[in-house]
């Protein structure tokens, strides 16, 4: 069985990507192994849609892999997040666009873990989120094509990305090639440009193609020019 997703890729043309359900299960199990202790006893709530791979993996497949309850309703506003019952503890699956609009005047809910992906989370928004919820966000890096690649937990600005177990990155002439159990054995070349340190961790330094990200959405400059 497959789930079909669409992404702009590096060309700007919509590209259909068929994700085997078994691959989504495997990705969720990788995440469960990595985060299980910190997610113990949490309920999942989210401000991201499950129509995208990030929302599908973290909002649906991950809590299922851990046997944890998930909140079906979307959280669109800070007020909905603040209104969550204090009877439970929550894992909040969110995005930079939502976190930068948090209302710090509201009463914070008992969030045990914040996950953010889909785009870069500016440092000032990391600090703001931590100030309100008293916890630092876990940032996730990946793509629809590759699945999860890396994560970081920033308590200061310049923290690099760390790859997940079984994910390997190789600098080649055409770009950085990723090898992962979630994709074909020959690997995939990333659209992003990475700068590695001596320990194999990395920073994101830009993109190769004419596709930019604005509030977690891939925007094709080619498509805009053709309109």
Model-derived regions, located:
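Conserved S/T- and glycine-rich ATP-binding loop of Class I adenylate-forming
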Residues: 7-10, 44, 56, 92, ...
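Conserved adenylation A10 loop of the ANL superfamily
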Residues: 4-17, 144-145
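AMP-binding/adenylate-forming catalytic core of the ANL superfamily
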Residues: 186, 191-227
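AMP-binding/adenylate-forming
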Residues: 18-34, 43-101, 138
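Active-site glycine-centered loops adjacent to acidic/histidine catalytic or metal-binding residues
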Residues: 10, 118, 142, 192, ...
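Gly/Ser/Thr-rich phosphate-binding loop
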Residues: 104-157
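Conserved pre-ATP/AMP-binding loop-to-beta segment of ANL
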Residues: 1-6, 37-43
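Conserved beta-loop-beta connector loops within the AMP-binding
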Residues: 162, 166-189, 197-199
